Amino acid sequence: MSERAALLAVAADPVRFALLEALTAGTTCVCELQEQVPVAANVLSYHLKLLREAGLIGAARRGRWIDYTLAGDALDRLHAALPRAARDGDRP
């Protein structure tokens, strides 16, 4: 699988897509993400780990909590990973 396809595959999962969407509002505590994306804590942790490994989000510990932030280049990287026709708005 190409790097572009792998990046899109990470973002395409419904839970991870919801997390990315929530993080477009800005830095968010994991406790708030749990409220916005109602999945079990271990499932949330797994999906956040995959997004971190893909470089789409960053994490910073604040006491016993972790704050998550959308990576500065995340949206640009996702846009660049799209097929050219999708980026240009062309229709088949």
Regions found by a protein language model. Give the residues of each.
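Amphipathic alpha-helical dimerization/coiled-coil segments
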Residues: 1-3, 21-24, 72-92
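Pre-recognition alpha-helix immediately N-terminal to the DNA-recognition helix
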Residues: 6, 17-19
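Short helix-coil-helix linker/hinge
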Residues: 9-15, 72-73
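Short capping segments at the starts of secondary-structure elements
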Residues: 14-15, 25-31
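Base-recognition residues in the alpha-helical recognition helix of bacterial helix-turn-helix
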Residues: 21, 45-49, 64
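Helix-turn-helix DNA-binding motif, specifically the short coil turn and the N-cap/start of the second
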Residues: 29, 40-43
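Beta-hairpin "wing" of winged helix-turn-helix
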Residues: 53-62, 69
